[in-house]
Swiss-Prot record:
In eukaryotes there are cytoplasmic, mitochondrial and chloroplastic isozymes. GO terms for molecular function: L-aspartate:2-oxoglutarate aminotransferase activity; pyridoxal phosphate binding. It catalyses: L-aspartate + 2-oxoglutarate = oxaloacetate + L-glutamate. Belongs to the class-I pyridoxal-phosphate-dependent aminotransferase family. This is Putative aspartate aminotransferase, cytoplasmic 2. It is found in: Cytoplasm. Keywords: Aminotransferase, Cytoplasm, Pyridoxal phosphate, Transferase. Its main location: cytoplasm. InterPro entries: Aminotransferase_I/II_large (IPR004839), Asp_trans (IPR000796), PyrdxlP-dep_Trfase (IPR015424), PyrdxlP-dep_Trfase_major (IPR015421), PyrdxlP-dep_Trfase_small (IPR015422).
Length: 421
């Protein structure tokens, strides 16, 4: 007699963007290229790791004084202090006033998981979330699984080929009172002083709760302070907010999942209350965060010589990415590819938009075996001397083949004020 399975009614899960990598791996084409890795890549096509991280990791592994005990639920205290100083600056108003703290988490996914659980329990009026489209696959489902209604928004204008500050202001103007607003790094969204003032005013008057995502500080401009300028604006205006801080990508410790949920409160008393609740939630989620990556990062951040080496390694990575973008733009211009390609070099960070429409992206994936996310945002560190010609020639071919049809015209998204996930 056959045994009934507990799992017989379990269906296949909805495929996420991660299935693009699965499709790539199943492709037998010898010249296939994947341009959507989350990690920073070297010119040799391997995940980038700072040399100072490798050196420090080796030293720690050989330290006979380490007893490899479990960390406290809140994490390594020295790591939290060093990471907060990195994020806000040692002389930050919030740090001086003792109204900022953090919980050591299992990467940025752990930070969102912890933060969303807290909001579900203690911010019960907020059941609507607007999340920037670049984070929707990674973190939108966390909110959705917790019972939030999730909408995505984008500040990328496919016609102007830039991050448009007017779109951001329009989004905030139209989203409902009391919702959660998840914001990534909008360093390329050139808000004027009056634009910043308007943004702050709307968020404050609508009692919107900001939840920032800082996944790779230092890999946008190589200036650690400039990369988190948006947080300084909000701190100076007395806002309270959450921030997911990931330190895996900018240190090249991808396998450790090193992150922190940062809490900025109105005062120290409220901060302590929030942290106490987060400790209980973290205890149920993972009890003890991972140790090794946090020790490596703390050792570097607390040693001026090692910190200088790390900053220099970030500068070299950013310069290499900028050079890659310049080469891509120049090659497309030399090929006579229709369109303006200046937007490629005007974007900061490892990831950026190519400015292609959905038909052109589909052509590259299906015909050229160049795997690009549907939104056309790629990881430029995946482009190197071995594949740049094939990639740019493929883009040129895709644009030329769709140029004469209406499909080649960028269609304005209807996601400016949100599409429900």
């Amino acid at each position: 007699m056959p045994t009934l399975s507990v799992f017989m009614d379990v269906p296949l899960a909805h495929k996420l963007e991660g299935s693009l990598l699965k499709t790539y791996k199943q492709d037998d084409y010898p010249n296939k290229i994947f341009l959507a890795y989350r990690v920073c890549m070297t010119n040799e096509g391997h995940p980038w790791v700072s040399l100072v991280v490798q050196k420090t990791r080796l030293q720690i592994s050989q330290d006979p004084s380490l007893n490899y005990e479990y960390l406290p639920t809140m994490g390594l205290k020295s790591f939290i202090q060093a990471s907060l100083a990195l994020l806000f600056g040692k002389h930050s108003q919030a740090i001086v006033e003792n109204r900022v703290g953090g919980v050591h988490t299992v990467g940025d996914s752990g930070a969102f998981q912890l933060g969303v659980q807290f909001l579900r329990a203690w911010h019960k009026d907020a059941r609507i979330v607007y999340i920037i489209s670049s984070q929707k696959e990674l973190h939108g489902l966390v909110f959705q699984d917790m019972g939030f209604t999730v909408y995505e928004y984008s500040v990328w204008d496919p016609k102007k080929l830039c991050m448009d500050p007017d779109i951001l202001l329009n989004v905030v103007e139209q989203i409902p009172h009391g919702c959660v607003l998840v914001m990534g790094n909008i360093i390329d969204c050139k808000l004027t002083p009056s634009g910043w003032a308007k943004l702050m005013s709307m968020i404050k008057s609508k009692q919107i709760f900001p939840f920032f995502d800082i996944p790779c500080q230092g890999l946008y401009t190589s200036d650690l302070e400039e990369d988190t300028r948006i947080l300084q604006y909000f701190v100076s205006q007395g806002f309270e907010f959450f921030c997911s801080q990931s330190l895996s990508k900018n240190f090249g410790i991808y396998d450790e999942g090193v992150g922190m949920l940062v809490v900025v409160a109105v005062n120290n008393q409220q901060l302590l209350c929030v942290l106490s609740q987060l400790e209980g939630l973290a205890q149920a989620l993972w009890l003890n965060p991972p140790n090794t990556g946090a020790r490596v990062i703390t050792s570097i951040l607390c040693n001026p010589a090692l910190l200088g080496e790390w900053k220099q390694s970030l500068k070299e990575v950013v310069e290499n990415i900028m050079l890659t973008k310049e080469k891509v733009k120049e090659k497309l211009q030399l090929l006579g590819t229709p369109g303006s390609w200046g937007h490629i070099t005007e974007q900061s960070g490892t990831h950026g938009y190519l400015g292609l429409n959905s038909q052109q992206v589909e052509y590259l994936v299906r015909k050229k075996h160049i795997y690009i996310p549907k939104n056309g945002q790629i990881n430029f560190s995946c482009i190197n001397a071995n594949n740049i010609n094939y990639i740019t020639e493929g883009i040129n071919e895709a644009v030329l083949l769709t140029e004469s049809s209406e499909m080649c015209l960028p269609k304005e998204k209807k996601t400016l004020i949100g599409i429900k996930l």
